[in-house]
Amino acid sequence: MKRRNFLNRLSLSAGAVLLSSGCRQPIDKKETPDKGDLAGNTNSGFIVEPSREIPVVDKTDVLVVGGGPGGVAAAIAASRTGARTILVERYNHLGGLWTGGLVLPLLSTHGLSRKNEQIKAIYGIGDEIAERLKNLGMAVNEVNPVVDPEAAKYVLEMMVKEAGITMYYHSWAANVISSDDTIKAVILETKSGRVAIEPKVVIDCTGDGDIFHLAGEDYDVMQFEIGLVHRLGNVDRVDPSRPGYNKINIGGETPIPSVNWVNMTGGEYEDALDFKRLSELQQEHRIEIWDN
């Protein structure tokens, strides 16, 4: 390589480094607190976590753990009574499996009457959510409408904000502190470290009963066919009038033209609380989606 070309490349590389460095702002350096010596015999397969003080970052009348549709409805209902309400969610969006898991049908908006006719069965906050999505043009079908997940996230976000609810994302419920059969504090695992919230009332909307379990309540372990839902685009680009065309139903209609959603269920019943098996299934299903 000629020296000039080498220097030119070197200067470009240096510029790239400077540019990337300039994208970050320095903050005050924080020292990692002393975790103490590791207690316990690691050869036994267990360790003992050293005790530590956990900062109480908030106090509230009602704490709702889990920001799925049930958690959002519970938080809005609590806030509308005048109670100060906090909603915590482990991910970066509301809606749970409805939005993040792409389980897009809004079930069940209708039921069968004694005359075997479809009658409306959803009212209250659930109905408000459905109507907002319809007004945005982001719901198809009157009965059990299929929605757009990003629109649903937006609608839920707006309703939570309008209700005056304090929202904490990226917060995973890790433990509870109980006394006299009452939860006094919920401990959250966050990127800021472990923090605690002291509520008067806790509503468990985690979907798996995490708070019930952490509080020491009895529970049953269920097994499910664990699948991975996905969306498929450009499914209506083929001219159906073309000779030899055979229609194949691939998934259900969504509010976005040419985009269908596909519910790929698992073939065997699995334990949804086994994080190792869930990790394996996540990999297997995602590869299967692309390979098929």
Question: Which sequence ranges carry the predicted segments?
Answer:
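N-terminal export signals
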Residues: 5-26
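N-terminal Rossmann-fold NAD(P) dinucleotide-binding loop
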Residues: 71
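Flavin (FAD/FMN)-binding glycine-rich loop and adjacent Rossmann-like elements that form
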Residues: 53, 125, 153, 170, ...
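Beta1/beta-strand and adjacent pyrophosphate-binding region of the FAD-binding site
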Residues: 57-68
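Short, low-complexity, disordered segments immediately C-terminal to signal peptides
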Residues: 24-39
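Conserved beta-strand-loop-beta-strand element in the redox core of flavoprotein oxidoreductases
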Residues: 177-195
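A short, basic/flexible loop-to-alpha-helix module at the beginning of a structural domain
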Residues: 44-59
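Conserved N-terminal/central alpha/beta ligand/cofactor-binding core
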Residues: 11, 77, 83-84, 89-175, ...
